[in-house]
């Protein structure tokens, strides 16, 4: 069984179904509303667990939300370490239009600090892969990659949202999983880059190969990128080649876009 350690944001995701997106100064009435726990790292943790991995997750929540988040993680088979903070949990508003495209606004809320990583060191040390993203403070990711380097753990990094990163992170990452916009911001990095291309699939930078996605009717693309990163991490941790892992990640992402919202869309491994 692959052992995956994931650090990320966890908070309340609020979904609004809209006929189209706003223009400046416009108010639109939503056709539906749904909420769930989410965040990039949180989504990736649940997705990896549903793929059969042993998942350890580190995140920060408002103290009032620690119990329900722990309960949800336990139900999904995710071993969660939650840093309870004296502030509100993070939240995100996700608008989805009639063709399944999304617009997302995030309020960070409760945030990890580097010392929170100290209590997660054992999970990193025993992991086959560490998965990180940019929804947590840079100093937290630095602390995590330093442990990964110390224990010789491969690092997958989903550089979203896009931002510049220090050399200590750039040098430690084994595989990056940006989308096309994030890839342009990432530039040249030592590790392998697998760029997600939406309905077109993904591209492996070192070979230039585009691996096509399976045909799918897009209902909601919100969780597709997190599904891709999680499945890629699990398959690489299991020893698959990068190309084979990309094929599996593409397939899982195609499944995810056909289901509304994130948690219901994260596929279970057959």
Spans of features found by a protein language model:
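Ribokinase/PfkB-type carbohydrate-kinase core domain
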Residues: 1-10, 70-84, 94-210
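Glycine-rich phosphate/adenosyl-contacting loop at the front of the ribokinase-like
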Residues: 1-58, 67-68, 218-219
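Conserved phosphate-binding/catalytic region of the ribokinase-like
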Residues: 4-5, 186-270
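Short, basic and Ser/Thr-rich N-terminal targeting/leader segments
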Residues: 51, 76, 87-90
């Amino acid at each position: 069984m692959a052992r995956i350690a994931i650090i990320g944001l966890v908070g309340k995701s609020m979904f609004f179904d809209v006929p189209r997106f706003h223009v400046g100064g416009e108010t639109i009435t939503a056709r539906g509303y749904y909420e769930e726990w989410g965040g990039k790292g949180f989504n990736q943790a649940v997705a990896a667990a549903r793929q059969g991995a042993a998942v350890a997750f580190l995140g920060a929540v408002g103290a009032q939300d620690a119990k329900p988040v722990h309960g949800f993680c336990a139900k999904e088979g995710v071993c969660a370490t939650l840093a309870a903070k004296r502030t509100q949990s993070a939240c995100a508003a996700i608008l989805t239009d009639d063709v399944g495209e999304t617009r997302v606004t995030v309020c960070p809320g409760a945030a990890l600090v580097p010392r929170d990583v100290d209590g997660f060191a054992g999970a990193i040390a025993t992991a086959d892969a560490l998965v990180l993203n940019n929804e947590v403070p840079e100093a937290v990711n630095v602390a995590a990659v330093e442990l990964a380097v110390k224990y010789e753990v491969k690092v997958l990094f989903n550089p979203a949202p896009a931002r510049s990163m220090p050399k200590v992170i750039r040098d430690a990452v084994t595989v990056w999983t940006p989308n096309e916009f994030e890839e342009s911001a990432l530039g040249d990095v030592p590790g392998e880059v697998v760029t997600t291309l939406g309905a077109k699939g993904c591209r492996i930078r070192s070979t230039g190969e585009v691996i096509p996605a399976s045909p799918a009717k897009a209902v909601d693309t919100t969780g597709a990128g997190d599904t891709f990163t999680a499945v890629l991490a699990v398959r690489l941790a299991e020893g698959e080649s990068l190309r084979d892992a990309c094929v599996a990640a593409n397939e899982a992402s195609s499944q995810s876009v056909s289901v509304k919202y994130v948690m219901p869309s994260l596929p279970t491994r057959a």
